[in-house]
Every structure is written in C-alpha cells, then in structure tokens.
From Swiss-Prot:
<comment type="function">
    <text>F(1)F(0) ATP synthase produces ATP from ADP in the presence of a proton or sodium gradient. F-type ATPases consist of two structural domains, F(1) containing the extramembraneous catalytic core and F(0) containing the membrane proton channel, linked together by a central stalk and a peripheral stalk. During catalysis, ATP synthesis in the catalytic domain of F(1) is coupled via a rotary mechanism of the central stalk subunits to proton translocation.</text>
</comment>
<keyword id="KW-0813">Transport</keyword>
<feature type="transmembrane region" description="Helical">
    <location>
        <begin position="5"/>
        <end position="25"/>
    </location>
</feature>
<comment type="similarity">
    <text>Belongs to the ATPase B chain family.</text>
</comment>
<dbReference type="InterPro" id="IPR002146">
    <property type="entry name" value="ATP_synth_b/b'su_bac/chlpt"/>
</dbReference>
<comment type="subunit">
    <text>F-type ATPases have 2 components, F(1) - the catalytic core - and F(0) - the membrane proton channel. F(1) has five subunits: alpha(3), beta(3), gamma(1), delta(1), epsilon(1). F(0) has three main subunits: a(1), b(2) and c(10-14). The alpha and beta chains form an alternating ring which encloses part of the gamma chain. F(1) is attached to F(0) by a central stalk formed by the gamma and epsilon chains, while a peripheral stalk is formed by the delta and b chains.</text>
</comment>
<protein>
    <recommendedName>
        <fullName>ATP synthase subunit b 1</fullName>
    </recommendedName>
</protein>
<keyword id="KW-0375">Hydrogen ion transport</keyword>
<keyword id="KW-0138">CF(0)</keyword>
<keyword id="KW-0406">Ion transport</keyword>
<dbReference type="GO" id="GO:0046961">
    <property type="term" value="F:proton-transporting ATPase activity, rotational mechanism"/>
</dbReference>
<keyword id="KW-1003">Cell membrane</keyword>
<dbReference type="Pfam" id="PF00430">
    <property type="entry name" value="ATP-synt_B"/>
</dbReference>
<keyword id="KW-0472">Membrane</keyword>
<keyword id="KW-0812">Transmembrane</keyword>
<keyword id="KW-0066">ATP synthesis</keyword>
<keyword id="KW-1133">Transmembrane helix</keyword>
Length: 163
C-alpha cells in the first residue's frame, strides 16, 4: 500500500488534528455549557415575562375593579345629590305654600277686621244719627223733664249695647 502525500491526505490530517484539538480544548463541553446557559437565560426571561404578564393582568383587574367601584360611588353620589335636590325643592315649595297661606290668612284677618271696624263705624254713625233724630223729635214734642229722662235712658241703653 502506498501512501500518497497529496493535498487530500494533508486535508484529512488537518481535519483530524483540528477535531482532536477541538476535543482536547473541550470545545463541545463549552459549547454545550454555553448553549445550556443560553437556554437557562431564555427560560428565565420567559419566566420573568410570564410573571410580568400575570402581574400586569392582576393590576388590570385591580384597576378595573377600582374603576367599577368609583363608578358605583359616583352613581351613589349623583343619586344622593338628586334626592337632596328633590328634598330641597319640596321643602322650598312647602315653605312657599306656607308663606302664601300665612299671607292669605293675614290678609283675610285684616279684611275681617276692616269689615268689623266699618260695621262698628256705621253702627256708631247710625246710633249718633238716631240719637240726634230722637233729640230733635223729643225737643219738639216733649218738655225738658221728659227729654232729660228719655235722653238718659237712651244713652244708658246705647252704652250697654255697644259695650
């Protein structure tokens, strides 16, 4: 068998030496370790991403819950304000009606008082007129003594009836 020292042989020897050097320097182990480290790093990044995603979902759920609570509280506040406005309106209406009723009653009372005063004035004027007429008639028809008695009786009767 004859060895040929041609280019193919030297390429083969170079390849074998390269592979031996690669194995001697533990390049496959380093590559495996590097790939394992990279895989661990990717796994950690995926776990971190998953944790961040879960945290984001938790925060989203919490903010949605807080938003719903705030909306419910706002609706409650609006309803309370509407109820209070209705109560204030009803109270103002009631007070206005009471004021009008009081004013009406006061006006009616003043009218009745004015009517009573007018009636009293008319009666007083009628009594004065009747007394004057009676005096005139009695003065023409009766003597002084009878006039004096009649006048005294009439005055006392008028006083008792008016008071």
């Amino acid at each position: 068998m004859e060895f040929h020292l041609d280019a193919t042989f030297f390429a083969f020897v170079g390849l074998v030496l390269f592979l031996a050097l690669v194995v001697y320097l533990k390049v496959p182990g380093m590559m495996a370790r590097s790939l394992d480290d990279r895989a661990d790093q990717i796994r950690n990044e995926l776990a971190e991403a998953k944790r961040l995603r879960e945290e984001a979902q938790h925060l989203l759920a919490e903010y949605q819950r807080k938003r719903k609570e705030a909306e419910a509280e706002a609706a409650h506040i609006v309803a309370a304000a509407e109820r209070e406005a209705e109560m204030l309106t009803a109270d103002a209406k009631k007070k206005t009606e009471e004021f009008v009723a009081n004013r009406t009653a006061l006006s009616e009372q003043k009218i009745l008082q004015a009517e009573a005063e007018a009636m009293k004035a008319v009666r007083s004027a009628a009594v004065d007129l009747a007394i004057a007429a009676a005096e005139t008639v009695l003065a023409k028809q009766a003597d002084a003594k009878v006039q004096s008695e009649l006048f005294g009786n009439a005055v006392s009767q008028v006083k008792t009836r008016l008071n």
